[in-house]
Amino acid sequence: LEFDSFHPHLCNVKSKQDGNQIKQNNIKNTVMSTKKLHFETLQLHVGQEKGTNLAEDARAVPIYQTASYVFHNAQHAADRFGLRDAGNIYGRLTNSTEGVFESRVAALEGGVAGLAVASGAAAITYTLQNIVRAGDHIVAADNLYGGSYNLITHTLDNQGITNTIVNVNNRAELEAAIRPNTKVIFAETLGNPNSDPLDFELVSSVAKKNNIVFIVDNTFGTPFLIRPIEYGANIVVHSATKFIGGHGSSLGGVIVDGGNFDWKANADKYPTLGLPDPSYHGAVFADVAGAAAFVTRIRAVILRDTGATISPFNAFILLQGLETLSLRVERHVENALKVVDFLKNHPKVKQVNHPSLPSHSGNGLYQKYFPNGGGSIFTFEIKGVQDDAWKFIDNLQIFSLLANVADVKSLVIHPYTTTHSQLSPKELAQQHITPTTIRLSIGTEHIEDIIDDLSHAFDQI
């Protein structure tokens, strides 16, 4: 795996004076590129290879709790601001703790560069803002997280960016939704809240045919189970608050640049990356940043101007979670599949919505793209009415009722009245959310305790 220059605020920036690639000054990510290391090793070591210059050769990634950085002299400061020297300028743009986190997630996803921001919502917003503007069009999946759905259908729509929401796994629907001004196809690896699998190859083929950027939210999938870039995605986003952090303790988001879209060849369609940027003296990001143009522009322009910066401390906490991602996800999946088996046979359950079940419409895609399993976040329908669903939830002891997922602790929520309550009846029906829908996020507790807790709650209704 080739991982080079993930950290600096402009990745692989070329000097206008000599055209030579400027290497980052304090973290090298090339040592491990001589050998293909396994996921479990990469999640521990990327960004801290031998030869890196982290504080006092610390084994743990240090927390660089600083707002600004000292320039060596006036020329050094001018070169940093003029993008002739790739390094730290100000804490809103870069930080060495954050740099390790960014490089590690990018490595695990197989991307060329990463950018960490304050939340998953910020990551998605910045990703879309980077290439769409008034008059453009977005095609999005009909099974998105409610916040992403509202961003696309309301917030961006109010800014003159139109949208079409479709079943992206249906080729006819997807192709019919494409317009001349379509800039993005946006989908999730496993849809929220039912973990419906995405047909990566189908969507990728349509995106490539029409020269459209394919963006995937891989929060529910995790790079341990699937790497969307390998299936044709151009950009991957994460809410790092979820599986990456894993403990519900810190907010964060990550954007990973696949480096596989030709911005120069599509400059008229994507002028922010392929044409001169007036806010940087006419610099063309596809030229100065090469394959990492996408995240480089977000860092240099959007993050500079709007400032949804992740804190060094949060980056450190999320790094601690990242180091055990593979171990936790294995346990999440193992437990989830056992819970699915328990629920599908329970007399008080009307239906279980999980792609591992042969009856699920996405089972074929699940078998194709998730050979190691997946979907520890899913829903089921309880028999009865909404009050029965609420009573079931209120009688759980181990499961925490809260608006988060992918914690090591098992979680529960009632989507109809909480996370998806702002959707219309039609939109709720499209996502198969009813008053008796219950969403579970299966944690890493002992499986017998999880099932006993569910059984106890069922006994109370």
Q: For the regions a protein language model found, what residue spans apply to each?
A:
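Conserved PLP-enzyme active-site core in the AAT-like
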Residues: S33-K35, G47-L54, L115-N345
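N-terminal "arm"/small-domain region of PLP-dependent enzymes with the aminotransferase-like
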Residues: S33-N95, S103-R104, T436-S441
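PLP-dependent enzyme catalytic core of the Aspartate aminotransferase-like
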Residues: V112, T153-H154, T162, P180-K183, ...
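Conserved small-domain helix->loop->beta segment predominantly found in fold-type I
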Residues: T306-T309, F313-A315, Q320, T324, ...
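Short, Lys/Arg-enriched N-terminal segments with co-localized hydrophobic residues
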Residues: D18-V31
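Conserved N-terminal alpha-helix of the aminotransferase class I/II PLP-enzyme fold
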Residues: N73-A122, G147-T155
